[in-house]
């Protein structure tokens, strides 16, 4: 089995932090695919329940402006951004992409990283 990768979507509002969901998958391409799917779900859902949601999908977020959803959609569909993202993961770095809804001070971060197996003590 290839080295596992993890991906997570988090939200920060003021001083509160929450994980909206995450996965551990067998390779970086699957991690990026999951992050792209979540970015599009969040952008297109705009806080409402999405019909094609699967158990591994993140909880919806209600944005108060259109900039954050548009940024998520652009990141998920732009070939150059996706090439940069996969190269970041290939190089062993953590991938971070954050969008902000300034109307309410909401930050949504998509992150992916190499999840090293635990070393025995």
Name each model-derived stretch.
Residues 1-19:
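Short aromatic-glycine-(Arg/Gly/Cys) micro-motifs in beta-strand/loop hairpins
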Residues 5, 23, 108:
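A broad, low-specificity signal marking well-ordered, structured residues that form hydrophobic/aromatic
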Residues 9-11, 25, 83:
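Residue-level detector of functional hotspots within protein domains
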Residues 16-33:
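A short, exposed loop/beta-hairpin motif centered on an aromatic-Gly-Thr core
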Residues 35-38:
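Short, well-ordered alpha-helical segments
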Residues 41-121:
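Short, mixed-charge low-complexity intrinsically disordered segments
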């Amino acid at each position: 089995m290839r080295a596992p990768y993890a991906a997570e979507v988090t939200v920060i509002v003021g001083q509160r932090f929450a994980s909206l969901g995450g996965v551990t998958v067998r390779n970086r391409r699957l991690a990026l695919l999951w992050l792209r799917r979540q970015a599009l779900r969040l952008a297109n859902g705009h806080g409402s329940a999405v019909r094609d949601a699967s158990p591994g999908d993140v909880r919806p977020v209600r944005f108060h402006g259109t900039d954050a959803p548009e940024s998520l959609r652009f990141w998920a569909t732009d070939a150059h951004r996706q090439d940069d993202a996969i190269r970041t993961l290939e190089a062993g770095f953590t991938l971070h992409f954050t969008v902000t809804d300034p109307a309410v001070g909401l930050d949504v971060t998509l992150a992916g990283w190499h999840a090293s197996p635990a070393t025995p003590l």
